[in-house]
């Protein structure tokens, strides 16, 4: 969800850490955590770093510092490019298996993911996987909040596709409006994926008469509120 890509990056963090044991969490507890950018989608990575705290947490942002994990030790008030341009020449290489171990776990998870996808029955996750895997290159994917973005972050998305989602609104506010506005602003072919509850909540967005002709909506009509079937206590809702 960062729209930053590299072969060594982990794009689907929940698939990596969900099966972790206590020993795995302790093994991958970081000494230094460096963050930049906006809100973190994954609840699991937040829970991991809040419990297995790094010794140092540096956040890089010209304006604000998010203490998402309750561990912030320093705020560098510069652009990330400026920070890394100055910091990288000062860094010293050390012997560590952290990266290779993580790469191995990533490989194993990918094998299991591919096997599961090939065997799974028709379900919400299959729909998201099929649609996202067939999006046109260099397009923009706008995703509704709640379960939609959580499914999407389990899927490998083509690096040429920009991904956006409303976060920090504690719900489904304005996802369709945001998607239409983004489609108008950047001119890229835009696909909006969301559930029926989120779609109808913001259906007034479709009253606008300037919606681009290539703007597409994929509506997952799964009976409403898929997130409530995922969260604890869903039996009582």
Roles of regions detected by a PLM:
Residues 1-2, 57-62, 216-221:
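Short internal beta-strands
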Residues 1-56, 158-186, 200-204:
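Glycine-rich, anion-gripping cofactor-binding loops and their flanking helix/strand elements
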Residues 37-41, 63, 146-148, 197, ...:
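Short glycine-rich anion-binding loops that position phosphate/pyrophosphate groups of nucleotides
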Residues 5-13, 66-75, 226-235:
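Glycine-rich, charge-decorated loop segments at or immediately adjacent to ligand/cofactor-binding or catalytic sites
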Residues 104-188:
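Active-site diphosphate/adenylate-binding microenvironment
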Residues 2-5, 60-66, 147-148:
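Short, polar loop motifs at secondary-structure junctions
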Residues 154-237:
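Thiamine diphosphate
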Residues 52, 57-101:
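Terminal amphipathic helices with adjacent charged low-complexity linkers/tails
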